[in-house]
UniProtKB/Swiss-Prot annotation:
Keywords: Early protein, Host cytoplasm, Host G2/M cell cycle arrest by virus, Host nucleus, Host-virus interaction, Modulation of host cell cycle by virus, Phosphoprotein. One of its GO terms (cellular component) is host cell cytoplasm. This is Protein E4. Its main location: host cell. It comes from the Viruses. InterPro entries: Papilloma_E4 (IPR003861). Residues 31-53 have a biased composition (Low complexity). Contributes to multiple aspects of the viral life cycle including viral genome amplification, suppression of suprabasal cell differentiation and egress of newly formed virions. Induces host cell cycle arrest at the G2 phase by associating with and preventing the nuclear entry of host CDK1/cyclin B1 complexes. Inhibits cellular DNA replication by preventing loading of host replication licensing proteins MCM2 and MCM7 onto chromatin. Within the cytoplasm, associates with host kinase SRPK1, a splicing factor regulator, and inhibits its activity. Residues 31-89 are annotated as: Disordered.
Length: 117
């Protein structure tokens, strides 16, 4: 049985902000497993895979390219295509302490947000 105390994936009007908020609640101290598919006013996102994001690896000041490959995990969610609404794929990748959120808007514009924690 799933842990009912675990944070749930975002379900509100602003999916990018909700997704980032959900990530912040989940990483790196807990393992996040949504209890149900992610639903927003414009799309439904099915969970494909979840992994725990690693703790922040040791870095030297101004050393931006030294992420240890052993500290790599990927969380990915993707919207199923349907005739009624075009697919809006979402990916959530956390490499070391960096969070990247990618999406494609309804007009085909690719949006990528990168955060370094």
């Amino acid at each position: 049985m799933a842990d009912d105390t675990a944070p749930h994936p975002p379900t509100q009007r602003y999916p990018l902000l909700d997704l980032l908020s959900w990530y912040n609640k989940c990483a790196p101290q807990t393992h996040c497993t949504p209890q149900r598919p992610l639903t927003t006013t414009t799309q439904t996102v099915q969970t494909e895979q979840h992994t725990t994001c690693p703790s922040k690896p040791h870095r030297h000041e101004n050393d931006t390219d030294s992420v240890d490959s052993r500290h790599h995990s990927t969380c990915s969610t993707q919207t199923p295509a349907s005739p009624a609404s075009p697919a809006h794929p979402w990916t959530l990748d956390c490499v070391g302490s960096e969070l990247t959120v990618k999406t494609v808007t309804s007009d085909g514009t690719t949006v990528e947000v990168r955060l370094r924690l």
